Amino acid sequence: MRIILASSSPRRRQLMELLGIEFEVEKPDVEEEFLESPEETVRELSLRKAEWVFKKRKEEEILVIGSDTVVVLDGNILGKPESLEEAKGMLKKLSGKWHVVYTGVAFVSSETKDVIVSSTKVRFRELPESVIDYYVEKYRPLDKAGAYGIQDFAAVFVEKIEGDFFTVVGFPLGMVWQYLYEKGWWKVASKREDDKGGARVAFG
């Protein structure tokens, strides 16, 4: 069985690489929309992404992983900004406040259709308008829910965090690994006598 990451996000690809398993990447063609709740939104969109790729390759023996992230501020869902001005507006709203980041991860194969959802609370410092302008103009966060990436300069915006850091990045790595491990899909491969490279990881 091969594993495919249904994503266009370079951050999710980088995090998947930390698992030490071989995988492919394919961008799903799924229109993003907000549903009644943030949990339902990330659950449904991550599943749609994984199913889109799975159906395209349904003749193959694969496991597809899809993921989606939203930011919630005062009960309102913030997705990806459509313009730099909208990005600045989002960051002004987040300044000095708590918000919640929700990330869903879906796993789809011929025998599996599971979704996990993780949430993390984040509090931003008070952000001067000049800093917001600098960040948006330099980093152009149009591909990020809430208009920021906690793994880049926006890390300095964070005053407090309660929960999983990688949920905010957009891919709760520990939960993904635990799921794969418990399913028997992530395992340490048997070391061959002629293998001088140390322990190896196998998938499937």
UniProtKB/Swiss-Prot annotation:
<dbReference type="InterPro" id="IPR029001">
    <property type="entry name" value="ITPase-like_fam"/>
</dbReference>
<feature type="active site" description="Proton acceptor">
    <location>
        <position position="68"/>
    </location>
</feature>
<dbReference type="GO" id="GO:0036218">
    <property type="term" value="F:dTTP diphosphatase activity"/>
</dbReference>
<keyword id="KW-0963">Cytoplasm</keyword>
<comment type="function">
    <text>Nucleoside triphosphate pyrophosphatase that hydrolyzes dTTP and UTP. May have a dual role in cell division arrest and in preventing the incorporation of modified nucleotides into cellular nucleic acids.</text>
</comment>
<feature type="site" description="Important for substrate specificity">
    <location>
        <position position="151"/>
    </location>
</feature>
<comment type="similarity">
    <text>Belongs to the Maf family. YhdE subfamily.</text>
</comment>
<dbReference type="InterPro" id="IPR003697">
    <property type="entry name" value="Maf-like"/>
</dbReference>
<dbReference type="Pfam" id="PF02545">
    <property type="entry name" value="Maf"/>
</dbReference>
<keyword id="KW-0378">Hydrolase</keyword>
<feature type="site" description="Important for substrate specificity">
    <location>
        <position position="11"/>
    </location>
</feature>
<dbReference type="GO" id="GO:0009117">
    <property type="term" value="P:nucleotide metabolic process"/>
</dbReference>
<dbReference type="GO" id="GO:0036221">
    <property type="term" value="F:UTP diphosphatase activity"/>
</dbReference>
<feature type="site" description="Important for substrate specificity">
    <location>
        <position position="69"/>
    </location>
</feature>
<dbReference type="GO" id="GO:0005737">
    <property type="term" value="C:cytoplasm"/>
</dbReference>
<protein>
    <recommendedName>
        <fullName>dTTP/UTP pyrophosphatase</fullName>
        <ecNumber>3.6.1.9</ecNumber>
    </recommendedName>
</protein>
<dbReference type="GO" id="GO:0047429">
    <property type="term" value="F:nucleoside triphosphate diphosphatase activity"/>
</dbReference>
<keyword id="KW-0546">Nucleotide metabolism</keyword>
